[in-house]
Amino acid sequence: MYKRQLAVRGLDEIIEYQKYPVKAAEISTKARRSLGIGYIGLAHYLAKNGVKYSDKKALTKVHELTEAFQFYLLKASNKLAIERGKCDYFDRTKYSDGILPIDTYKKDLDEVCSITLKYDWDYLRKSIRDHGLRHSTLSAQMPSESSSIVSNATNGIEPPRGFLSVKKSKKGPLKQIVPQYTTLKNNYTLLWDMPSNDCLLYTSPSPRD
C-alpha cells in the first residue's frame, strides 16, 4: 500500500519538476500526468507463496495481487487530486464517467478465476467522481529487463526462461540467477517447461490500467 503511494507521489513530482525541451510536450504531459507503474518479480512472488506459475492457483494469487495493485494506485492518485487538484484532462478519461478497471477487464477471465473482490470499489468510484484523479493513466506492465537486473528480480510478469540467465549490459554479459534459488527452485516454473501458454494468456492481461 505505502510503496504504491510513494511511487505515485514520487512520479508526480518528477512530472512537475523535470525539464521539457519542447513546450508542447510540457503542456501535454502536465495536462495528462500519465504514469506507467508496474511490478517486477511476479514469478518470484508466486514461488515464495508456494504456487507454480503454471498452476491454476497462480491465477487466484495474481487476481488478488492485481486488485490491490490497481486499487491503491487509484486511491493514491485520488488522494493527490484532493490535495493538489485533478489533472487538466481528467474529463477526457474513462474515470470521469465512473468507469474503473473492474468494469473493463476481459470477462472471459471469470471462467478460469472467479473470486470476490476484496476492496471497497464503490467508495473509490464515488471519491473519484467527486474529486477526480491526479493522473489520466497509472499502470503499465513492461518486461523490465534493466530494473530486474538492478533488483535481482525475475522479469516483470513473465516466468523465468531458466534458473540462470545471461543478460547483455554495457559492461558485457551479466549472469543472473533466479531469487532464492536454493530454497525455491522447486517452486519455479520455467517458461520452456510450461505444459501450455494458458497461464501466460490469462495472467498477462490482468494487471493493466
Outline where the language-model segments fall:
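Long, C-terminal-biased catalytic regions of enzyme "large/alpha" subunits
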Residues: 3-204
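A short, hydrophobic C-terminal helix/tail in secreted or cell-surface proteins
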Residues: 205-209
